[in-house]
């Protein structure tokens, strides 16, 4: 598939793609609309690198956006393929990679389409802050599982569907502190860890860990936490 064509898979909300595409030009601005994501990125990277030797690993970053995590993993030696359905974001990611001299294979492609082409090709797949933005997150997980080699690792992050998550990630972050643009998140699409665990089992993946991720807006820092009420990370393995 040409890396700039519209994907065949329809597992996306066009309104979501448009919303994030509008942020493309400031994706790499650490003080811009994606400021919290910049704070979360080192935590995500540490979570992955603690469980996977990135040097030489073939890694797929699903829903890569402007390439924050993709570039970070490539800097640690991973051979990264990164996909997103928003052409504007992929363009920004490619340009930033050129400016930073970091090599990542960026594509406008769905994970479902890629799974049909490259089954069992990757040592690891990352899918961060994406599942809560698609109509069928279970299809994303199944496609990620297909793309993994036996023994391959899947890393996920998402938002829990709890009153705390609604208060902090929606009301607090979008309407009070205005850390994120309004409409970034939809509470009904948040995912409980038990739901995620069931989806992983159905995809024949073994859940190994669930860890909370705490964002401290007053310091603009994030860290791992034992509390999973708002943001959390998960790690699963393909037998």
Curated annotation (Swiss-Prot):
Domain of life of the source: Bacteria
UniProt pathway: Cofactor biosynthesis; ubiquinone biosynthesis
Residues where S-adenosyl-L-methionine binds: 44, 63, 84, 128
EC number, UniProt record: 2.1.1.222, 2.1.1.64
GO BP field: methylation
Gene Ontology MF term list: 2-polyprenyl-6-hydroxyphenol methylase activity; 3-demethylubiquinol 3-O-methyltransferase activity; polyprenyldihydroxybenzoate methyltransferase activity
SUPFAM superfamilies reported for this sequence: S-adenosyl-L-methionine-dependent methyltransferases (SSF53335)
Keyword set, alphabetical order: Methyltransferase, S-adenosyl-L-methionine, Transferase, Ubiquinone biosynthesis
CDD domains (UniProt xref): AdoMet_MTases
InterPro entries with a match to the protein in the record: SAM-dependent_MTases_sf, UbiG_MeTrfase
Family note: Belongs to the methyltransferase superfamily. UbiG/COQ3 family.
PANTHER family given in the database record: METHYLTRANSFERASE, UBIQUINONE BIOSYNTHESIS O-METHYLTRANSFERASE, MITOCHONDRIAL
Protein name: Ubiquinone biosynthesis O-methyltransferase
Organism: Xanthomonas oryzae pv. oryzae (strain KACC10331 / KXO85)
Lineage: Bacteria, Pseudomonadati, Pseudomonadota, Gammaproteobacteria, Lysobacterales
Gene name of the encoded protein: ubiG
